[in-house]
């Protein structure tokens, strides 16, 4: 299975300013596999340490963090010589031993020749809770579920993925039915590596759904195991409300859908916990279109999306036939899946600020508005081929953006400053 993040890891390996690397991401998005595969492909040897299942390693880091001493201990544990130039050190579930995190500072300052990559499913929570952290002494890489282009590659359609990257839209249009069929499959399967691998090998949607159910069950177990007891019920209620939140025409998060009479102060910690885990994406509202968009962020108004479109369908009980064959009763939730899909693809684009826009009266709403650092692009999302976009026109008249995007199942088309970008090509938005 190919992950685009592998290119970023290789760039990190070759950098003269390399620091210990921390890979962030939700549970089961493929962090462990990526680190091990990176070691297998680009290093002579790999020493893998899982701090969740190895108490001896906790003892090693408990006292002195002298790097020579630590390397000796790792060599004794692994039974292998650690060559700074040819050995990859992998620290997995590193949040379980906070002093292992702290040691990264000393590796950077005193032994930068060693190649160290770290990951942890709940690392975001550990950092937020005040674990001593080597600020400025580490590099970061965020890993998400497989994007649609990665899904195409995993499904044996590498050339189709390459064609999207080349943005040859006349040729892309010639093969649009292949892309549309694959996109419908992606809506069901999503991008969680185990689900994608199963689908690529067996094409069994029932098996995919069982895998997704197991992943969701593991997340629920994490709530009980790792979250503070007093907020576990709130996390569960909030988590389970997300499909119904997104099924509404106005997808702004409403606390009253979690529990009648609920208020923001009751659930802010639960949202933060899920966000720190990487299980939800919080997309805030802006009411203006200046650069940087973050300066116009309204922290009180936001949408909550799940980490993966396949998991959203699983939580909602969406059947394969309904999605692939179509059903008139499915129209409303199709909008939820489509917006979830677009959010998920946008999140994979590096250094892209993602928000949504409404004016103060609420009469104009743009599904997403993204900040590339050089320009602000409004993005209107359509689940089918309907190209009517009244809000987008209103936005254009007010802010006159250099480019506006309407993404739908319709073919690529550019008229003046308006681009219709096919949903299956939305990853290319920053390249327009």
Where are these predicted regions, by residue range?
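Pre-Walker A adenine-sensing motif
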Residues: 2-16
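Interdomain motor-coupling "hinge/lid" segment immediately C-terminal to the ATP-binding subdomain
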Residues: 128-247
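Hydrophobic positions on the alpha1 helix immediately C-terminal to the Walker A/P-loop
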Residues: 34, 38
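Accessory nucleic acid-recognition modules appended to NTPase machines
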Residues: 200-365, 369-370
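Structural recognition of the conserved hydrophobic beta-strand(s) that form the central parallel beta-sheet
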Residues: 90, 115-121, 142
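Conserved catalytic cores of phosphodiester-cleaving nucleases, focusing on short active-site segments
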Residues: 346, 366-385, 404
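Conserved lysine of the Walker
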Residues: 31
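Short glycine-rich substrate-engagement loop in P-loop NTPases that contacts/grips substrate
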Residues: 53-85
């Amino acid at each position: 299975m190919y992950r685009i993040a592998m290119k970023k890891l290789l760039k990190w390996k070759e950098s003269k300013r390399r620091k210990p690397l921390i890979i962030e991401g939700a549970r089961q998005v493929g962090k462990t596999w990526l680190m091990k595969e990176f070691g297998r492909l680009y290093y002579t040897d790999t020493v893998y340490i899982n701090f969740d299942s190895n108490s001896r390693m906790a003892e090693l880091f408990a006292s002195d963090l002298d790097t020579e001493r630590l390397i000796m201990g790792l060599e004794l544990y692994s039974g292998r010589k650690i060559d700074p130039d040819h050995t990859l050190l992998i620290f997995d579930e590193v949040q379980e031993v906070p002093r292992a995190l702290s040691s990264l500072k000393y590796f950077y300052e005193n032994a930068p020749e060693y190649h160290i990559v770290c990951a942890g499913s709940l690392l975001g929570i550990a950092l937020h809770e005040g674990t001593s952290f080597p600020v400025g002494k580490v590099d970061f890489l965020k890993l998400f579920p497989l994007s649609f282009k990665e899904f195409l590659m995993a499904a044996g359609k590498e050339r189709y993925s390459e064609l999207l990257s080349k943005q040859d839209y006349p040729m892309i249009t010639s093969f649009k039915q292949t892309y549309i069929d694959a996109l419908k499959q992606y809506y069901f399967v999503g991008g969680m590596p185990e689900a994608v691998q199963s689908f690529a090998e067996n094409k069994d949607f029932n098996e995919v759904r069982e895998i997704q159910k197991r992943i969701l069950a593991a997340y629920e177990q994490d709530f009980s195991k790792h979250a503070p007891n007093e907020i576990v019920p709130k996390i569960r209620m909030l988590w389970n409300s997300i499909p119904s939140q997104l099924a509404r025409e106005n997808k702004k998060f409403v606390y009253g859908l979690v529990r009648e009479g609920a208020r923001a102060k009751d659930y802010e910690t639960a949202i933060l916990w899920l966000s720190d885990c990487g299980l939800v994406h919080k997309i805030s509202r802006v009411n203006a279109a200046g650069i940087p968009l973050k300066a116009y962020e309204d922290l009180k108004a936001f949408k909550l999306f799940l980490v993966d479109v396949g998991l959203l369908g699983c939580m909602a009980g969406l059947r394969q036939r309904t999605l692939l064959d179509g059903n008139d009763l499915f129209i409303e939730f199709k909008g939820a899946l489509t917006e979830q899909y677009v959010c998920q693809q946008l999140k994979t684009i590096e250094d892209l600020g993602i928000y949504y826009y409404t004016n103060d009266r609420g009469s104009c709403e743009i599904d997403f508005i993204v900040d590339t650092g050089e320009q602000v692009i409004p993005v209107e999302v359509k689940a089918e081929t309907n190209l009517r976009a009244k809000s987008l026109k209103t936005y254009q008249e007010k802010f006159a953006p250099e480019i506006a995007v309407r993404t739908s199942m319709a073919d690529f088309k550019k008229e003046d400053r308006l681009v219709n970008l096919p949903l299956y090509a939305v990853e290319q938005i920053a390249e327009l």
